Amino acid sequence: MRILFILSFLTFASCDNSSLPKQKGFFAPEFSYPKYENQALCNFKFNRNLSSDIIRINECNYEIYYKDLDAKIYLNKIKLTNNLNELSLKFDEKVFNNSEYADQILTSEYSDPSKKVYSRIYFFVGDSPSNIQFYLTDSVSNYISSSTYFNSKPNYDSLLPYIHYIRSDIRKIIESFDWINE
């Protein structure tokens, strides 16, 4: 009887009914090494990742589409007519509206006076609808506003590898950017 009691006690004591939920795991995407070619559009040119497609929206507005990432970079060309400050304020307003969903905003500037290329890039950390926005200007007559969108629900942790990939492409676009004389 004593042995039966001890065996019963050990049987019930060793049963642990608490279970942990199955962790969701995501595979890290593997990207091929990007290859670039020079792309001329409207009155500007830059190095474009060959894994992306350029889609013309209208006259001088384009979309760089990454089919494998289901992501888009919009390039909106605006002609400057002494309204650089006004455009900068509108762009800042757009950044402010987008920042509502961001935990942090990181900025970076780029300038190449020899090519008359000036840029400011905004990186949004968090579940923001657009994780990267930037503009390019010659500060005289040309201004390009740009934003990046993924065709998915904003989930920063899941999108982070894709954001890093596109961020390096955007840096390549900006560093290789050049205005074509009109």
Predicted regions and their residues:
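Sec-dependent signal peptide recognition
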Residues: M1-I6
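C-terminal motif of bacterial Sec signal peptides marking the signal peptidase cleavage site
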Residues: F12-S14
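Bacterial signal peptide processing site
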Residues: D16-S18
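Post-signal peptide N-terminal segment of mature Sec-exported envelope proteins
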Residues: Q23-N43
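Secretory pathway targeting signatures of secreted, lumenal, and periplasmic proteins
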Residues: A40-V95
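Surface-exposed amphipathic alpha-helical segments
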Residues: S52, S147-E182
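Signature of long, low-cysteine stretches enriched in small and polar/charged residues
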Residues: D53, L89-S147
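Second-shell loop/turn segments in exported
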Residues: I73-T81, Q133, Y156-H164
